[in-house]
């Protein structure tokens, strides 16, 4: 059972950065939302971006919407854990709130691409757990992009072209999940998160926890 301090059963634990990446349309955003809704204490990393706000998006909840000069200033001040250019726009993860969450034993979920994942690893490799989501087929990926009706045909063609490059980096990830059924894929991702949370090296309070029990047994 998880307690309010970010540990399990009273054992202090360091948080982790849980990364989901995929080609556009493979399901990482849907899986991210499902995971945040169900996993206790997991928070979604909020990125800064220069792209225009889409209908229904809220500044500070979905993204921090900033202009290019502001974004460049944040890069110059080393305020990002990772940042990248994606489809003529910029995205970056503010450093301070993530570092505070990990220190408090809370996990942070990242919906980022392979470039961002590599930057996270270069800065904090022991804290990063990465999962790459694949579609079951190219045809299914294209169908999903058309069905969500967010982009023009020209943009969709660009995303399909980009997908091949993104998939080529699958071997840089810790885990691979093929999303041919969203429910099954979600259970797989959730199981990965749970197992990583319980790794001995992340339970930084386990030595004291065991020592205390041994002391009681020796009385």
Curated annotation (Swiss-Prot):
It is an enzyme of class 2 (transferase). Keywords: ATP-binding, Cytoplasm, Kinase, Nucleotide-binding, Transferase. It catalyses: GMP + ATP = GDP + ADP. PROSITE patterns: GUANYLATE_KINASE_1, GUANYLATE_KINASE_2. It holds the Pfam family Guanylate_kin. Residues 15-194 form the Guanylate kinase-like domain. Essential for recycling GMP and indirectly, cGMP. PANTHER family: GUANYLATE KINASE (PTHR23117:SF13), GUANYLATE KINASE-RELATED (PTHR23117). Belongs to the guanylate kinase family. NCBIfam families: guanyl_kin. This is Guanylate kinase.
